[in-house]
Amino acid sequence: MRIKLIAVGGKMPGWVEQGYNEYVKRMPRDMPLQLIEIPMPRRQKNADPHKLKIQEGESILQSLGSGDHVVALEVEGKSWSTPQLSQQMERWRMSGQDVALLVGGPDGLSDACRARANQQWSLSPLTLPHPLVRVLLAEQLYRAWTILQGHPYHRE
């Protein structure tokens, strides 16, 4: 199983790349975490945010494989504890499908992305900065994997 983090935006600060890559290196070979960055359209003064969100959504959907299990990261999604995430990860692994985690741009995910999603996951009711979400996701995925392996990284 491959996990794809499909995120709108690029040109992250060095600390984001360093933090994200630290956890990517720790992921097992049979469950690699791959980042797919979707370029953010230019946001000019009179740009229509709805049209930009649709454009971002089309690019996200083009990055998906036909058999991907899609998880949209949405504030309104279901909240999981880390042990619950590890259970989700085990179900994803057992399904044999690749997993695509979708992170929208500043205006969120398009309706088409939400419609394509098999699940919606909320990291927090707070609005989180997109750079931080990348690091947080990578760490939580690694932590969930360690729970499945009985590794002492996660402590209750």
Curated annotation (Swiss-Prot):
- For the ligand (S-adenosyl-L-methionine), the binding residues are L73, G104, L123, S124, P125, L126, T127, L128
Keyword annotations? Cytoplasm, Methyltransferase, rRNA processing, S-adenosyl-L-methionine, Transferase
Localization annotation = Cytoplasm
| Pfam annotation, one family | SPOUT_MTase
Report which reactions are catalysed by this protein: pseudouridine(1915) in 23S rRNA + S-adenosyl-L-methionine = N(3)-methylpseudouridine(1915) in 23S rRNA + S-adenosyl-L-homocysteine + H(+)
The record ties this protein, via CDD domains, to: RlmH-like
Record's InterPro entries? Alpha/beta_knot_MTases (IPR029028), RlmH-like (IPR003742), tRNA_m1G_MTases_N (IPR029026)
- What EC number(s) are associated with this protein in UniProt? 2.1.1.177
Which GO molecular function entries does the Swiss-Prot or TrEMBL record give? rRNA (pseudouridine-N3-)-methyltransferase activity
Q: Write down the top EC class of this protein.
A: transferase
Q: Which family does it belong to?
A: Belongs to the RNA methyltransferase RlmH family.
Stated role: Specifically methylates the pseudouridine at position 1915 (m3Psi1915) in 23S rRNA.
**Could you describe the subunit structure of this protein?**
Homodimer.
NCBIfam families with a match to the protein in the record: PRK00103.1-4, tRNA_RlmH_YbeA
Q: What is this protein called?
A: Ribosomal RNA large subunit methyltransferase H
